[in-house]
Design a protein with these regions (language model features):
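An exposed, glycine/acidic-rich loop-and-rim segment of catalytic or binding clefts
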Residues: 2-355
Length: 355
């Protein structure tokens, strides 16, 4: 049976106490969570030799999670991704959100969900689960409505990490939640993933961006482009520096429209760390996965977990979510959450070994 331990972490700059929630399963694999940002701090799973590897990037101290702009492992919202110029119109009313990424609103603004200490609920009878809860007030970063948000993490004996997001608001609002974990399946300290990780994405289409990193509104076939990961290939083989889209983002920072079926969960992506043999399958109820190749990561040893140094392309993100800036593109599936209706999405990260 799984074991759950709760240990003190470090206080935030505001003096708020934070904690680490460590779920360890029968095989010795574990997931560590933090109530600041309802974040994933570590995922430790066995490699092909039976050694345990931590396969997500993270910070050594709380100030990294509180202030750095990489969002390591964080729950981001109310709306992940970019909203162009922080502007949208809802029910005939114009809204101006905080602008925290050039001229755009990114991942919910300055004081987004990753910057907040969530209330954690644990139950001794369910030792493989942690529930985080947050109240986001009306006007939070410019969003309408008082919103209650819940994130439930479960880690089982099969090395499956399940994340379930739910939310409800008393006014119509925007809601698009994701987890921003950075994966390096060879181990978080093992350097670039471009030449030693294979990636397959279950998507025949992707969403192009403009030079401001906002969606153009098009949905484009991946065939004959750098973005064709319909068969497994090295991540680096998809980063064609001559491609204009890659140039805009300094790598891959794009939304892929998943090939959906009638199943509740669709396979979004599969990855393998070639050196470790650790594999990852990502299933989701969402319509897309945003793939980011850590294009602007620059974390010095005094900040990285276990004194790690993280640089460009040192990980990849599989951010399951609705389409970015959907509120400004009528052809995209909506991210509007109606008053008193329930938002619910689920993603499963399944870790295995290719021996």
């Amino acid at each position: 049976m799984s074991k759950l331990r709760v240990v003190n972490f470090e206080p935030t700059s505001k003096g708020e106490n934070t904690h680490l929630y460590i779920i360890e399963n029968n095989s010795g694999a574990s997931v560590t969570l933090c109530d600041l940002g309802a974040s994933v701090v570590s995922i430790k799973v066995p490699n092909k030799n039976g050694s345990i590897r931590d396969v997500v990037l993270g910070y050594e101290h709380i100030d990294g999670y509180e202030f750095d702009g990489t969002y390591f492992g964080a729950t981001v919202g109310r709306c992940c991704g970019r909203i162009a110029y922080g502007k949208f119109t809802l029910n005939g009313e114009d809204y101006q959100l905080s602008v925290n990424n050039g001229s755009n609103h990114l991942h919910g603004g300055f004081n987004n969900f990753s910057r907040k200490v969530w209330l954690a609920v644990v139950d001794d009878k369910v030792p493989n689960t942690v529930l985080f809860m947050l109240d986001s007030p009306d006007g939070d970063e410019g969003y309408p409505g008082n919103m209650k948000v819940f994130v439930r993490y479960t880690f089982d004996d099969e090395n499956v990490l399940t994340i379930k997001w739910s939310a409800v608001s008393d006014k119509d609002t925007i809601c698009n939640l994701t987890n921003h974990s950075y994966f390096n399946l060879n181990g978080h300290k093992s350097g670039k993933v471009t030449e030693n990780h294979k990636l397959k994405i279950n998507a025949n289409s992707f969403i192009p961006i403009n030079s401001n990193l906002n969606p153009t509104g098009e949905i484009t076939p991946v065939k004959n482009t750098s973005f064709d990961f319909t068969e497994p290939k090295l991540i680096g083989n998809g980063i064609d520096r001559k491609n204009e889209q890659i140039g805009f983002a300094n790598g891959i920072d794009h939304m892929f429209e998943l090939n959906h079926s009638d199943e509740e969960f669709v396979l979004a992506a599969e990855a393998e760390g070639i050196d470790s043999g650790i594999t990852l399958k990502c299933y989701t109820s969402q319509k897309g996965v945003h793939v980011y190749t850590a294009n602007y990561v620059d974390v010095l040893p005094n900040m990285g977990k276990d004194s790690a140094t993280y640089g460009e392309n040192s990980a990849f993100c599989l951010e399951t979510q609705g389409f970015p800036d959907a509120v400004n593109h009528k052809t995209f599936p909506t991210t509007i959450l109606k008053a008193n209706e329930n938002y619910t999405q689920t993603t499963k990260y399944i870790f295995g070994i290719n021996k």
